[in-house]
């Protein structure tokens, strides 16, 4: 298609409208692409909408590239946190260590306000912990902000299911594949697998700091306060495809979280959700050519770090798309 003064505008189709897809679509639009997002469900029904969304690298590899993408995303979020309309804020929290020796985490240089926990700050059973400041995104507001920003810049969202990347890219100059766990089918990638995460939202009893307790012997545990609620988690069930919340799992999550934070006992439950994190041995962010010759940038396999890596990966994906057409 043509833009002002007859300039040819490259057409990009982004597959997927979770945080990876919307961020990539915005990055493409800011590079001058005409952008159309194609997705099977609206943003509020994606895995991203289920996320507790603390900046924290989780189940994403390799570490060196994850650190680079994550640091860039942290930088962008720091700017977004200045605008309350984005749903992003900088929050203080703690990661608890029960098995690991409290050395230096590999992601330390990406965060601010880092320090080791003092002994009196630790709950029973913990060998150590870290306090740090990190972005927290309230995903309903943040996804709405991203979609509004994309549409305000001239991008569009089309809700329909596609059976292949070739179908999605009909009429486009480049495809950007941000299909999450569904890349197993669309990209014909058997290395992609679901990591099921279940959470519940409860009324916030006055909590301000997030708590991450990955090594809890009773199961993965995290508490993420937001403006009007708390997200309590969670699970990391590899290979399980169900997005139906399990009542027994919800009870166990609430029990673990209440043991860490007694103020959660009796908290009013607002919602149960489950989503499928896109697991993969490594994040796939690379260019390939689809049958028929259309270039395709793959951007998936972020594990539990979709929000954490979103802008770093989006900008690199947009750069790859630009290079493919140059």
Curated annotation (Swiss-Prot):
This is D-amino-acid oxidase. Monomer. It is found in: Cytoplasm; Secreted, Cell wall. Keywords: Cell wall, Cytoplasm, FAD, Flavoprotein, Oxidoreductase, Secreted. Gene3D superfamilies: D-Amino Acid Oxidase, subunit A, domain 2, NAD(P)-binding Rossmann-like Domain. The gene is dao. GO terms for biological process: D-amino acid catabolic process. It comes from Rubrobacter xylanophilus (strain DSM 9941 / JCM 11954 / NBRC 16129 / PRD-1). Catalyzes the oxidative deamination of D-amino acids with broad substrate specificity.
């Amino acid at each position: 298609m043509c833009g002002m003064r007859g300039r040819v505008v490259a057409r990009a189709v982004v597959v997927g409208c979770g945080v990876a897809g919307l961020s990539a679509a915005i990055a493409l639009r800011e590079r001058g692409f005409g952008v159309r997002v194609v997705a099977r469900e609206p943003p509020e029904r994606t895995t991203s909408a289920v996320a507790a969304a603390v900046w924290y690298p989780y189940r994403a590899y390799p570490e060196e590239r994850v650190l680079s993408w994550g640091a860039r995303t942290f930088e962008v979020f720091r700017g977004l946190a200045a605008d309350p309309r984005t749903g992003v804020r900088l929050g203080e929290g703690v990661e608890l260590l029960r098995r690991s020796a409290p050395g230096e985490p590999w992601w330390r240089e990406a965060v601010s306000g880092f320090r080791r926990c003092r002994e009196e700050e630790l709950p029973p059973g913990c060998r150590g912990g870290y306090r740090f400041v990190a972005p927290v995104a309230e995903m309903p507001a943040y996804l709405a902000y991203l979609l509004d920003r994309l549409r305000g810049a001239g991008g569009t969202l089309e809700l329909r299911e596609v059976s292949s990347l070739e179908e999605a890219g009909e009429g486009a100059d480049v495809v950007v594949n941000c299909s999450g766990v569904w890349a197993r089918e669309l990209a014909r990638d058997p290395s992609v697998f679901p990591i099921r995460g279940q959470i519940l939202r409860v009324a916030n009893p006055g909590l301000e700091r997030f708590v991450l307790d990955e090594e809890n012997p009773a199961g993965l545990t995290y508490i993420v306060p937001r403006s009007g609620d708390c997200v309590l988690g969670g699970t990391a069930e590899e290979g399980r495809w169900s997005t139906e919340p399990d009542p027994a799992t919800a009870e166990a999550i609430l029990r673990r979280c209440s043991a860490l934070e007694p103020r959660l006992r009796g908290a009013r439950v607002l919602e149960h959700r489950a989503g499928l994190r896109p697991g993969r041995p490594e994040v796939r962010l690379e260019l390939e050519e689809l049958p028929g010759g259309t270039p395709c940038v793959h951007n998936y396999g972020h594990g539990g770090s979709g929000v954490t890596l979103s802008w770093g990966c989006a900008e690199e994906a947009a750069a790859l798309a630009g290079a493919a057409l140059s």
